[in-house]
Amino acid sequence: MKLTCVMIVAVLFLTAWTFVTADDSRYGLKDLFPKERHEMKNPEASKLNQREACYNAGSFCGIHPGLCCSEFCILWCITFVDSG
C-alpha cells in the first residue's frame, strides 16, 4: 500500500515537473515543424552539417569519432591513404 502511494506521488510529481520546466508547452510543436521543413529544403542550413573544428590525423580524440576530420578515431585520429 505504501509503495503504491509512493509510486502515484512520484508519477504526479514527474508529470507536473515536465509541464513546469517546458519552455512553451502549448505551441512548442507548432514552431518546431516549419524549422525542420526549412532544413529539409536547404540541407546547408542544418547546424548538424556544419563542423566548427575538427582534429587532424594524430590528434587525441578519445572515443569520439565526430571530433576527427576523417571520422576515424581509435584514441587518436586516423586517416587512411589510398596507394593507387
UniProtKB/Swiss-Prot annotation:
Domain remarks: The presence of a 'disulfide through disulfide knot' structurally defines this protein as a knottin. The cysteine framework is VI/VII (C-C-CC-C-C).
PROSITE patterns documented for this protein: DELTA_CONOTOXIN
UniProt keyword ATP-binding, yes or no: no
Disulfide bonds: C54-C69, C61-C73, C68-C77
Cellular component GO terms held in the UniProt record: extracellular region; host cell presynaptic membrane
Main location group: secreted
Pfam families, alphabetized: Conotoxin
UniProt name for this protein: Delta-conotoxin-like MVIB
Modified residues (Serine amide): S83
Function noted in UniProt: Delta-conotoxins bind to site 6 of voltage-gated sodium channels (Nav) and inhibit the inactivation process.
Native species: Conus magus
Residues modified to 4-hydroxyproline: P65
GO molecular function annotation: sodium channel inhibitor activity; toxin activity
Keyword Disulfide bond annotated: yes
Source species, domain of life: Eukaryota
